[in-house]
Amino acid sequence: MKDLLNFLKAQHKTEEFDAIKIGLSSPDMIRSWSFGEVKKPETINYRTFKPERDGLFCARIFGPVKDYECLCGKYKRLKHRGVICEKCGVEVTQTKVRRDRMGHIELASPVAHIWFLKSLPSRIGLLMDIPLRDIERVLYFEMYVVTEPGMTDLEKSQMLTEEEYLDRLEEWGDEFTAKMGAEAIKDLLGSMDLHAEVEQMREELDTTNSETKRKKLTKRLKLVEAFISSGNNPEWMILTVLPVLPPDLRPLVPLDGGRFATSDLNDLYRRVINRNNRLKRLLELAAPDIIVRNEKRMLQESVDALLDNGRRGRAITGSNKRPLKSLADMIKGKQGRFRQNLLGKRVDYSGRSVITVGPYLRLHQCGLPKKMALELFKPFIYSKLETRGLATTIKAAKKMVEREEAVVWDILDEVIREHPVLLNRAPTLHRLGIQAFEPVLIEGKAIQLHPLVCAAYNADFDGDQMAVHVPLTLEAQLEARTLMMSTNNILSPASGDPIIVPSQDVVLGLYYMTREMINAKGEGMYLAGPAEAEKAYRTKTAALHARVKVRITETVVDEDGHSTTETKMVDTTIGRAMLWQIVPKGLPFSIVNQKLGKKQISNLLNEAYRKLGLKDTVIFADQIMYTGFAYAALSGVSVGIDDMVVPPAKYTEIAEAEEEVREIQEQYQSGLVTAGERYNKVIDIWASTNDRVAKAMMENLSSETVINRDGEEEQQESFNSIYMMADSGARGSAAQIRQLAGMRGLMARPDGSIIETPITANFKEGLNVLQYFISTHGARKGLADTALKTANSGYLTRRLVDVAQDVVVTEHDCGTLEGVEMMPHIEGGDVKVALTELALGRVVAEDIVKPGTEEILIPRNTLLDEKWCQIINDNSVDKITVRSVVTCDSDFGCCAQCYGRDLARGHLVNQGEAVGVIAAQSIGEPGTQLTMRTFHIGGAASTAAAENSVQVKNNGSVKLNNAKFVINKDGKLVITSRASELTIIDEFGRTKEKHKLPYGSSLSKADGDAVTAGETVANWEAHTMPIITEVAGRVQFVDMIDGVTVSRQTDDLTGLSSSEVTDAAARPAAGKDMRPAIKLVDAAGNDVMIPGTDMPAQYFLPGKAIVNIEDGAEVGIGDTLARIPQKSGGNKDITGGLPRVADLFEARKPKEPAILAEYSGTVSFGKETKGKRRLIITREGGETYEEMIPKHRQLNVFEGERVERGDVIADGPEAPHDILRLRGIHAVTQYIANEVQEVYRLQGVKINDKHIETIVRQMLRKCTITHAGDSEFLPGETVEYSQVKIANRNLEAEGKEPARFERELLGITKASLATESFISAASFQETTRVLTEAAVSGKRDDLRGLKENVIVGRLIPAGTGFAYHQDRQAKRAQEQEGPSAAQATDNLAALLNAGFSSDE
């Protein structure tokens, strides 16, 4: 028996391995895997159903069909194990060897492997340096290739057509050899000397100057070096032996009715074997060349189809015209091996059912139907029945359970106690889509779900289904309880806000409970406490909303945990006093002494969590829910048609609007306004009418007049049901009420444009046919969009997870000194996001000092929690540097200090936390809420008047940032720099507002001046760009010749004349090379110099510039010499919503990106070409840089102006690659984070910046080597950043020269495919390409990420699996080192001692 056990163990041998290597298989290797050659195409005998000998299912090669039984039946039973039957040749063993025993086919002629031939770039073509077309011609027998030139003038691997070949043959006879087919290619590959090739290419690389040649050489060099280093032989890319898949992996199943269902592979294999056998026969018969050639070509095609059907030519189809599924199709795509079976498997012990409400459950419970529980917990029940001695065998136990005896239910109760189950709702968009609950047995067949977790699951009870999974092992139960229990997931991992928040009925109930009513029954009573308030309410002495005075006892808990109480009389209502009874000790009464809407309740829970911790919050949340439901029921709030009150003002408003529209129509017909203006005005009128009607309706709904105690009339908030629902945030919004009781307003067409006839009716009055039809028009688009959006959002999430899956917190502190700067987001006059909100939960990278002093407020490496943030606020700090994942220095993953607080737990992140996946989920999950639209800016909807002044909103002082200016004769400042910013600073030095100042703005305040709110500080002309003089003097025109370079116009009304500079293209020949300019001279006629330089003040005028001054006029400093009209932005589409987020993460270049200065220096313009201008930047050292810029781009710089690297030269959307190259990593991180946040903020979705930073870190994973130093890298090669870092560290340690590099920004799809792990990349996209590349270069996958480990089927190196992997690595390191000398002596001594002691 013992050896049997050992034998069975031997079958399941799992090697502990650290890496997986992929390579090309040699023919000998394939033969060594094989258990025999498949010689016949037959499968099984149709009469006996036994496999044919030497066929595709042969039992002799692949193993027995039945366990421990040979085919002819001579040997049966276990005792003959391992015997090979002499009659049928079958080894007696288990059937399952048919799943892993392979066979092989000896090919009669070599065949090229289609992946290495056709998967671009063609590896065979690249290696031999022959175009793919030519290789294909050789392979498919259309051309000869010279394999041995001999003493002829032919070259090796030269192509010859049939005729050329015959000519040469006559000329030289058998002096040379030329062949066709895969044999020829195999010979050529076999005769390559890789080392010599490398030498030659390295020499060429040094000598060549052409960029394209260099690129090609580098590519080829990398491939050849890969072949050398991996030990792959190039001729293995040509197959001479074909492996045959084990038969149980390509089954043949008899169906009833004598037909068979078979895997497509069998057809493909059969085809190969038939052709191969025919070819063998033809070769034996020495058939004519043309026949043999045709057969060889057919063999090549059939092998191609087997490996990757449809890659070349038409796909081979089966009987039903459907292309056959080849080996390549088996592994790729959503239905392929990777995504279907390795990354997502179906699991046992699970069930699903419809969900329904469980309002009486506690937060950690769920209701599980008894029937389901009985089925799911069967094994536990069986074992309990057996250990109790209630059933003798498992079979008896099974019978008892099937009969559902009474004792079984008792045991089920016991088994279920404290055994959590997992509930999952598809689609699982973030980790809160699977949570653990303790089951409570219920009658019925629906799972009961706690209402508060619906938000996390995004579940509702309109027929949603959920799946139940049972964690079986003790470890799994422990993890479910400690990590996944719903009570441990109160905060959202995306933003750190509570996600267990009441909604709908509960909110309505609490809102109703905390409202107040004037002159309600019992107003003005004095009550001794909340209990007395409740008594008054229950005995109907006082109404729920009555305003009363109640004695309240508050508990204040200080930081050390000591609590003090204080008691006082408070003005409140009966309802609020009763609600106070369930609020846990330690919260102030003021927090419930207000009308509670959804926002306030969320805040209430947040406060509770931060002040009192998890347990109290969970209990409190449950109490809130029970109370909310109870009072929602008591409130009797419902929706009746009379609750929708239509304001009487509506009809007059509409009549007025119709009158205005009629007027505009008349103006249009008489030609006073254009069609576009008429449309815009009409839409404007209706939009404002709609707003006015809505306002009147809300005023009407939201307040009512009541008589107070003194008998006077007083306004109070209305108790109208619909108003209460919207006001509390339970259901509905002002916009929806507007449609019920106001007017529906303007409708959009599917393309986003607005229909100019609005729907004046509302739903209470009812729509007529036309109005209904207009409504349906836009609504259908909405439904179609939703379906698309779900798929797109899911795909975005998949790409994000794939790129970030291997970011895990691997160490506590990486020791970096870098970080990113954080400032509050300020737009114009308002703070969009406060600094404290951004900094909360981050670690400080540089000491934060008190502004204006050297006093350190917060030392570096402090985790900023709520208390520290309060200090930042109190000391009005407005700029701090915090650590960030982007600047983290860990080689793999990131460190805890750089990540900061784990948002879902509220403390520093634990090691092993899979922060990458969390980041991906947090960004992807709200994706379905984002719109798909690109917004058309056009029409009234959104054309704001162009800004032309800065009006400040706060008192404070002016501060100018990177501004150059001159002071004109009126004493105003005129800005002469580009990217100037005006900020308003309050008395604490905090930034309150930020405004951009264009070139040529005039300021009435100087730097440091005080301003008051409402003052206008700066103004400028909106649609023109001035040219400002920085010196005073007399104007002298240069090259400004009327009719040649300028054209003059005189205004009829004013009599003033102006000149317009003609575009270079439109000038007559004489003016082509002239450069019109305005020069300033002093009274003596000498050039005036620009202050601080030795350059004369000369201003070149671009085309279309308008000059209003005369030659010889006197000008002062800061005067305008000329104006250049700017085209207004026009109707640009802004990409919004989901597509915008995808574009940012894919790092796509915008259509017309902004042009940024590559270097700092002085601008000048060179010779122009037909469509482009030549911009020259002269750097400090005198070297110049040139760039050609299309003429239609508007430039922001003039001749002679100084620019800094990264300044904008021509406006447009900035390309992230440019930002990275010119302004560095911080700038690009900030750019992507802000742009992504912009989209989410519009939808009201809150996501923490660190998630976006985590993704950006992964996008910056690669870098390009600019200078190799003493490293192994090639210049221009793209390498993993961590590799370069490690290599440079080692080089520096040895005192050698490190490599220099530039960081690269990759889009997420590209970054996923460029990952080091080929397993992860192959399971993501483009499986064929990834695997081909990996095999050729003999890649090894160190299984670092999560995905690779899931695929090979072991614990992931994150979370609880992190420790397991760390232990394994430590053990492995120890094994490799071997025992030290000292240890060896100790071991020896111990052994000897043991030997002596046992002798006694």
Curated annotation (Swiss-Prot):
InterPro entries xref list? DNA-dir_RpoC_beta_prime (IPR045867), DNA-dir_RpoC_beta_prime_bact (IPR012754), RNA_pol_asu (IPR000722), RNA_pol_N (IPR006592), RNA_pol_Rpb1_1 (IPR007080), RNA_pol_Rpb1_3 (IPR007066), RNA_pol_Rpb1_3_sf (IPR042102), RNA_pol_Rpb1_4 (IPR007083)
**Major enzyme class:** transferase
Q: Which GO terms describe its cellular component?
A: DNA-directed RNA polymerase complex
| Lipid metabolism as UniProt keyword | no
- GO:BP terms for this protein? DNA-templated transcription
- Domain of life (superkingdom): Bacteria
The record's comment on cofactor binding reads: Binds 1 Mg(2+) ion per subunit.
Pfam families, per this entry? RNA_pol_Rpb1_1, RNA_pol_Rpb1_2, RNA_pol_Rpb1_3, RNA_pol_Rpb1_4, RNA_pol_Rpb1_5
Q: Which cofactor does it need?
A: Mg(2+); Zn(2+)
Residue positions annotated to bind Zn(2+) 1 are: 70, 72, 85, 88
Single GO term (MF): zinc ion binding
State which Enzyme Commission number(s) the record gives: 2.7.7.6
| Annotated Mg(2+) binding sites | 460, 462, 464
What role does it play?
DNA-dependent RNA polymerase catalyzes the transcription of DNA into RNA using the four ribonucleoside triphosphates as substrates.
Subunit note:
The RNAP catalytic core consists of 2 alpha, 1 beta, 1 beta' and 1 omega subunit. When a sigma factor is associated with the core the holoenzyme is formed, which can initiate transcription.
| Annotated family | Belongs to the RNA polymerase beta' chain family.
* Protein's UniProt name: DNA-directed RNA polymerase subunit beta'
Instruction: Give the species this sequence originates from.
Output: Vibrio vulnificus (strain YJ016)
This chain is encoded by the gene named rpoC
